[in-house]
């Protein structure tokens, strides 16, 4: 069955919720608690680590529960509505804390931990079934890529729109606060707006995809705790899934670290004003749209693994180049528009590659779920995409964790009153640039062992259809 454009739109619109959350957690959360509220980066990292432990347990369980659900609205859609309240309310509460409350480090830590966990839990309840639905809408090797290309584009669009609102409305530079992100007053309105955007996104995708609520290849509906763990064990025996999981995991650690430190780099290394940072969003929009157009066409004649490996290579090599050039006085002065335009091509290429790799990975996971179904005779799209949801959270969670530890290690000051010295800023650049590039070697090596190509997937589908 061919998927209509409007149906892809309604499905992909659900990714806006995760895009808003990812943008906030990746670029703003650590900065807000460390440099605005005054929580020690190490404690912020600990809160993220504990939340990740909860995710590691809830994500796969949510995947299996969704796979086994029997409901008049199908096995995915009931959870769309169930996730809205904890997701939206907890996200708002996370950014509603006020500097004027004068809380101790202990209470700041508990506040961040509590609402980080419940925001992620609400996202798990919605996101895992939503990703799984995308795989079930089509089993075509190429159309599946098109579906997830649209999903990736909407996810980036949600994050970029959230960032646009942040820099152009909430965190404008003022005489008292340059950059405006150091102003404690607008953060509660930033959180409120994000919560509303996330909720609208879920409702649109819920009503727009009800046509596919009964898309299922699985008749088994009962489940218990023993079944949940047996299904997880089946997935862990699949070599393709293990390659995907650990390859994506190291991409998440590497790029999550890069993204979590970006606001620090823009503020203290490049010394950009808020209007300049907001102007970069246009480049991100262009690069994301480029990936959306490019990848579905490339996959028509190239294997997904080849596209992914090439994208990983460029995403690793490009970002450190402007840092090295700037340190050698080859680029324009910090804080200038000339520097902005000099960095623009590097950001465009790197983000196009990053978006392309994400589109390909999501499409690959659908192929892997077909292979697991062939081997186990049980459809496990929910569990497969639970792993993707979990690693997506690791992208932000481990990124913040490692970034917080790195900031502690280099002695980066906390709070908005103390500025870092030259040595601390240089150390920040070395972590965010060259160190991240070295880390990206690991996922390249792992994904080079991925074996599902066009012909193998065709054989898998032939065997499934013959049953």
Describe each PLM feature range:
Residues 1-467:
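Membrane-embedded alpha-helical bundles of multi-pass transporters/translocases
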């Amino acid at each position: 069955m061919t998927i209509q454009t409007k149906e892809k739109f309604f499905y992909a619109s659900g990714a806006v919720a995760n895009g808003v959350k990812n943008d906030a957690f990746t670029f703003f959360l650590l900065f807000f608690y460390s440099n605005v509220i005054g929580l020690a980066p190490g404690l912020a990292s600990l809160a993220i680590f504990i939340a990740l432990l909860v995710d590691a347990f809830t994500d796969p369980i949510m995947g299996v529960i969704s796979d086994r659900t029997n409901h008049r609205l199908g096995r995915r859609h009931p959870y769309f509505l169930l996730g809205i309240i904890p997701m939206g309310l907890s996200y708002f509460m996370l950014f509603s804390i006020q500097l004027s409350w004068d809380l101790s480090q202990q209470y700041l830590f508990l506040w961040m931990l509590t609402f980080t966990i419940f925001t992620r839990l609400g996202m798990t309840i919605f996101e895992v079934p939503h990703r799984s639905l995308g795989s079930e809408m089509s089993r075509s090797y190429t159309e599946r890529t098109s579906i997830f290309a649209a999903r990736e584009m909407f996810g980036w669009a949600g994050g970029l729109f959230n960032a646009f609102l942040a820099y152009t409305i909430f965190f404008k530079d003022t005489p008292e606060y340059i950059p405006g992100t150091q102003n404690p007053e607008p953060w509660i309105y930033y959180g409120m707006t994000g919560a509303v955007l996330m909720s609208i996104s879920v409702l649109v995708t819920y009503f727009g995809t009800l046509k596919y609520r009964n898309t299922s290849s699985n008749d088994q509906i009962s489940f218990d705790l023993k079944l949940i763990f047996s299904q997880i064990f089946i997935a862990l025996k699949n070599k393709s899934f293990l390659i995907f999981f650990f390859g994506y995991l190291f991409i998440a650690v590497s790029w999550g670290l890069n993204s979590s430190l970006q606001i620090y780099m823009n503020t203290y290394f490049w010394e950009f004003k808020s209007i300049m940072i907001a102007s970069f969003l246009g480049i991100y929009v262009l690069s994301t749209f480029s990936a959306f157009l490019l990848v579905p066409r490339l996959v028509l004649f190239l294997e997904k693994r080849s596209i992914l490996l090439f994208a990983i290579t460029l995403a690793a090599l490009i970002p450190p180049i402007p840092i090295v050039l700037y340190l050698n006085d080859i680029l324009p002065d910090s804080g200038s528009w000339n520097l902005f335009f000099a960095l623009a091509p590097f950001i465009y290429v790197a983000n196009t590659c990053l978006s392309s790799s994400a589109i390909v990975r999501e499409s690959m996971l659908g192929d892997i779920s077909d292979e697991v179904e062939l081997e186990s005779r049980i459809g496990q799209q929910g569990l497969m995409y639970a792993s993707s949801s979990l690693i997506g959270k690791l992208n932000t969670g481990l990124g913040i964790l490692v970034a917080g530890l790195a900031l502690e290690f280099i002695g980066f000051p906390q709070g908005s009153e103390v500025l870092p010295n030259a040595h601390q800023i240089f150390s920040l650049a070395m972590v965010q640039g060259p160190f991240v590039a070295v880390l990206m070697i690991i996922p390249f090596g792992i994904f080079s062992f991925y074996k599902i190509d066009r012909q193998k997937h065709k054989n898998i589908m032939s065997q499934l259809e013959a049953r």
